[in-house]
Amino acid sequence: MKQSQPVLTIVVPCFNEEEVFQETSHQLTEVVDDLIEEKLIAEDSKILFVDDGSKDRTWALIAMESIRNKKVTGLKLACNVGHQKALLAGLHKAKNRSDCVISIDADLQDDISVIRDFMLKYHEGCEIVYGVRRSRKTDTFFKRTTALGFYRLMNKLGIKLIYNHADFRLMNKRSLEELERYPEANLFLRGIVPMIGFKSAEVLYDRKERFAGKTKYPLKKMLSFAFNGITSFSVAPIRFFTLLGFVLFFLSAVAGIGAFIQKLLGHTNAGWASLIISIWFLGGLQLMGIGIIGEYIGTIFSEVKRRPKYAIDIDLYNEQLSPLQRQEKERLEKKYS
């Protein structure tokens, strides 16, 4: 059991979350207050909201809340970079001022009451704690089925994932330092974090309905996320098409020998239907194979450019404000104090 009280930062990526922000901030503040009262975390623990280039009033709400509530702070990214990179920005920022960091989405679907269980596991010596959904009853049939298929496929491809785990997890400082050593531009944290190793534990919870607003992960984003996960961690799809190519070559050779023998025996068939079907079949396979190779080439292209993953516009966490931003904060403080 750890004796000292660790500094905890809860990192919450946000994109157009004005409908749910106030409730999320309120509930997380209550959790932090309870943990401080139980002496499970230090009094200077924080809730860090990361605004991922929102188009609504999300950042204004974060800035105002940081004035009213000293446990709340914010990080504003210069533009929308996506959930994974926004989350990584928060983790990087929180690492230097925290003993442990918990990441959670802003929609309140993850059960915040188990954050206490996360901290108990941390005090027992766990360096990474995964929040695992007990069931997916709140998901639609389509999402539940596709998610199950995705996890099974990833396991078949040899990719180590925590089943029914998203990005609700605790990481201590040492594991966050290890995470910084992974330079991937195409982030798939659900695959990267288990690779770090270290002592870990799982905490089960029941996933709730979204408190308000609409999901920020439509089908298009989910498919892109899945493809990114596969191409970032496995070359099995390319090997599959290589093997399929050898099999089709063998079958075509057998068919060619058979046709030659029939020709020698004087048996000839027009075979237009079979010819057209085989051409379309092989053409489709070739296009699929080219598409998969293209995905890998695109992934390589993104990686070799080594572009920064995000740019920070305003950092309330470290008070790195320009004179104009400082004036705006002072104006808000006068207005809401």
Curated annotation (Swiss-Prot):
A GO MF term: glycosyltransferase activity
GO cellular component: plasma membrane
Alphabetized InterPro entries for the sequence: Glyco_trans_2-like, Glycosyltransferase_2, Nucleotide-diphossugar_trans
Enzyme class: transferase
Pfam families the record matches: Glycos_transf_2
Protein's cellular compartments: Cell membrane
Keywords: Cell membrane, Glycosyltransferase, Membrane, Transferase, Transmembrane, Transmembrane helix
Membrane spanning residue stretches: 241-261, 273-293
UniProt topology in membrane: Multi-pass membrane protein
Enzyme Commission no: 2.4.-.-
Family indicated by similarity: Belongs to the glycosyltransferase 2 family.
PANTHER family the UniProt entry points to: PROPHAGE BACTOPRENOL GLUCOSYL TRANSFERASE HOMOLOG (PTHR48090:SF1), UNDECAPRENYL-PHOSPHATE 4-DEOXY-4-FORMAMIDO-L-ARABINOSE TRANSFERASE-RELATED (PTHR48090)
Identification of the protein by name: Uncharacterized glycosyltransferase YkoT
Organism name: Bacillus subtilis (strain 168)
Organism ancestry: Bacteria, Bacillati, Bacillota, Bacilli, Bacillales
Gene: ykoT
